[in-house]
Amino acid sequence: MAADTPKTSPPDDAFAIRPAVREDVASIVRLIHGLAEFEKLTHLVQVTPESLAPHLFGDRPVAEALVAERAGRVVAFALFFTNFSTFLALPGLYLEDLFVEPQARGQGIGQALLEHLARLAASRGCGRFEWSVLDWNEGAIRFYQRMGATVMPDWRICRIAGPALAAFADPPRG
């Protein structure tokens, strides 16, 4: 390129995907709150930057995150962790949450995050890349199906949390 060629700045809708760093935790928490609002689950959110940071960047991290940044602002995140398939005898990559701010949607950010995670899963020798979707989120379901994902109709999520978890972990002895 000639020295007198003007430098162009990236378009306003340009974004970059990168691994999250500790300094992104407050932005990730902000986006988690946005996700909870979208899912109508704000009453369940307890996360704070202080409670999340050790799980992503502590001595024994249990999850990882990617962020999408546009014009210096984190506008999307994907939080994921390794699981394991006994049937395949291979690790898997499980996407816990992905959220793109409403004003940043429709620009390929969500798909780019998913493609990045798929490449990461393949490079780590994972046999599966999985996630859950709310049954009422028909737009997301159609999007995932167009990508080639199978929405598993025969499976349901089971969860024990809070007081029920404590009670089950320490049953009365008799």
Describe the residue ranges of each PLM region.
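Conserved acetyl-CoA-binding loop-helix of GNAT-fold acetyltransferases
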Residues: G106-R119, R146
